[in-house]
Amino acid sequence: TLCELMRQLVGHGNYASISLADFGKDFMLEPLIHAQAVITDENDVGTYVDKAANLKAVVTGDAININRKFKVPLTYCFHGLVVQCLNEMPRIRDKSDSFYRRQLFIAFTKCFTGVERKYIKQDYLHRQEVLEYVLYKVLNMNYYSFDVPGACENVLEEYKEFNDLVRQFAEEIFPV
């Protein structure tokens, strides 16, 4: 539902859906050229991302090379928002602080199984007045950057341990 709201705000044709795994594959980044945001509802469970350099560069607006089928590759800087929805934490080969500092994990702990109200996603999020209200609130907030809540910092620490077997071992043997 959150991704649908974001897509409606950005507008059709102004977003791309590129999974975490696809950021490391040839020919999968061309949609970035026309996108203002990457909004991905689903990533495969159990995904292992071997190559994270493009993901890191896209998140921070650095230059990347985009290989295009039967066309000349081009260098491109993406200056949009990247949102990836996950059902479980992915394993990433890159365990550096430069990767971790680019991530903001937000845990959605509420479960709506059996009480899903599809009309919210299918009706409300497409209403002009709802979109105008949300956009007004976003544009009229006093902020320069995102604050990182303690809950998000905790999830990041959990993720660092989950993603790094050496760190897991150290936490078990040498608890703080």
Positions of PLM-derived features:
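Feature primarily recognizes SF3-like P-loop helicase cores of small DNA viruses
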Residues: T1-V176
